[in-house]
Amino acid sequence: MPWRVAVVLPAREGFSPRAVGAIGLQVAALAGRQDVIVGPPLDGPSLLPDHEYRAVQPGLWPPGRRSLRYAAAIARAVAGTGAAVVEVHNRPDTADYVARHRPGQRVLLVLHNDPQGMRGAETPGQRRDLLRLMDVACVSGWVRQRFLDGLPDSCARQVGLSPNGVALPAMAPPMAQRARRVLFAGRVVADKGADLFVAACARLAPTRPDWDFRMIGADRFRTDAPVTPFVSDLRPKATAAGVDMAGYRPHAEVLAAMAQAAIVVVPSRWPEPFGMTALEAMAAGAALIASPVGGLPEVVGNGGLLCAPDPATGLAHAMAGLMDDLPAREDLAARGRAQAARFGIEHARACRAAMRDAALRRGGA
């Protein structure tokens, strides 16, 4: 596309190799040549050194909460970009501020999480007001349904699907050559079921000494993530269960670990809005076990084993079934690779480009 897009990151989203979350990774993966990234100051080199990055800091005006001052700083920053479309990620209040303070500016709000838990989109009335000013792209059908909940059917035309994408490796190590390892990769928090994973491993480790169990992740997506009470409580339990807690690792190392592990487990309690870890695990050729919540079922399809992780006895049973059955792991890995191919980077870029084009041509309702 020949016109420019200003891509706005949330105020706490990193965009450097050693400090980046899921949103930043997808922004980098789907970026167009004309994109300028606008967000908080970087903690290191940019993920996209060939793209312009405009760092913003909340000023003193307008008075009020920090998120309002960040939105005002964003509005000032995008004014000088010459962007035809301002693409705001996961912050309805920021998108609303930009649209209201820059009349005529085309805005696309990209939602990665449940909008009903976001400031400025909690109620149907707020979501309807957003559609008067902008178009909305959702990373999954589940997120889209949550946005449209309580709105008239006529609103659906302005709320589209723009799924996340994954770079599918040309080859994945055969299951028979992989480490006998069960891997958890993600934030080490209760919502992600980190404690359920440890509890399941504790049941399995004594009877399967030829397998090992590993967790990659921390409370936050950065090397200096805080050691929370949850993490402190989990560490001795993980040690007793024989689970290696590796802490935060850069994204490339996480993908490499997925390519080596036989099984990856995504035992989320909360309704995952998409489930990027599950998609990456399937693309890497691991056998996947995931929770049947939120957007995970539509991402996983038949490419993984859907299993409620709570209580952990059920999760342990599902893990044991795959650990003890190489042909089952091989079959699941093959189906996972096929499912992941449906979410390739080029498809994701095409979906995002179509949403940007619609926002430019249509504007608000």
Regions from the language model: what does each represent?
Residues 118-120, 127-128, 132-158, 166-168:
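A short, active-site helix/loop in glycosyltransferases that binds the activated sugar's phosphate group
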Residues 227-252:
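Nucleotide-activated donor-binding/catalytic signature segment of Leloir-type glycosyltransferases, i.e.
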Residues 263, 287-290:
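Short hydrophobic beta-strand element within catalytic cores of glycosyltransferases
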